[in-house]
Amino acid sequence: MKSFVLLFCLAQLWGCHSIPLDPVAGYKEPACDDPDTEQAALAAVDYINKHLPRGYKHTLNQIDSVKVWPRRPTGEVYDIEIDTLETTCHVLDPTPLANCSVRQQTQHAVEGDCDIHVLKQDGQFSVLFTKCDSSPDSAEDVRKLCPDCPLLAPLNDSRVVHAVEVALATFNAESNGSYLQLVEISRAQFVPLPVSVSVEFAVAATDCIAKEVVDPTKCNLLAEKQYGFCKGSVIQKALGGEDVRVTCTLFQTQPVIPQPQPDGAEAEAPSAVPDAAGPTPSAAGPPVASVVVGPSVVAVPLPLHRAHYDLRHTFSGVASVESSSGEAFHVGKTPIVGQPSIPGGPVRLCPGRIRYFKI
């Protein structure tokens, strides 16, 4: 009798920790902070950063919801909604994401929202589908925290373009190294005091010596491309003229190593990197972004008047979620159902914890 009671108690305990499959909806809903859910979300963030062609890396801030669908004959697919925050690391910067600082609210933070399908098979996570968008915090919210903090400025504004050109020219004139070409204008702000334009931009090294350049059009990118990142400010002097301050950091070249993909997952396309030899961002001709569509990359024109790189220009949700083998997986309209009324079943815990701050 004691053995029967013990067995019954163990069965009840197991039921408390297992995640039941909803027999009506066909999926299960684990907690948003469940370890497997978090691993799937982190795999998605890693995928996003590897495929961003410009702008800054994003980091996971919160998991909003999750559904786990069975995939036949093997594996399961996590249908996840996540919030991300922009970091201060450019996408060309090889610094590990864990070492990148989140851009603070007083610096005009940018938040991303993503719907992602992640395949878990044989203990490995692979992204099947990604749809994202991102937007800066509202001016009102920034002003509440910091009335004098500068806001993001349009990247094609003539004052921004001028500040980048002057800052890069100043750096090249004082450099003993390679002549640097502009890759993209990444971020800009109009600072009220002192009156100035603050800019951040990506660059690439060429085969020319900076101080010896006469005709920049004859300079070519290095065979093994090397990128860098610059921060500058152009301050308006009270009696006229400009005070230019700029610092640039060149990154070590990073070899691209193809990663093996589990059966049924799309092969990752190589990260699309802006071509520094192409036209620089300006008011006359905006650059183009790239959309990840399975193993291919499709060019998409960027909006002319923008202050940041919107994730939707790369992750527009056009990729298929069908696997190349096994039964196809489709996320469509699901029945509206309540929580499974299973005695001793777990309480759903979503959305998950906020890792930084909410905007």
UniProtKB/Swiss-Prot annotation:
Cysteine disulfide links: 32-350, 89-100, 114-132, 146-149, 208-219, 230-248
Phosphothreonine PTM positions: 314
Glycosylation, residue list: 99, 156, 176, 271, 280, 282, 296, 334, 341
Protein name: Alpha-2-HS-glycoprotein
Transmembrane segment boundaries: none
PTM comment text: Phosphorylated by FAM20C in the extracellular medium.
Region (Disordered), start-end ranges: 257-285
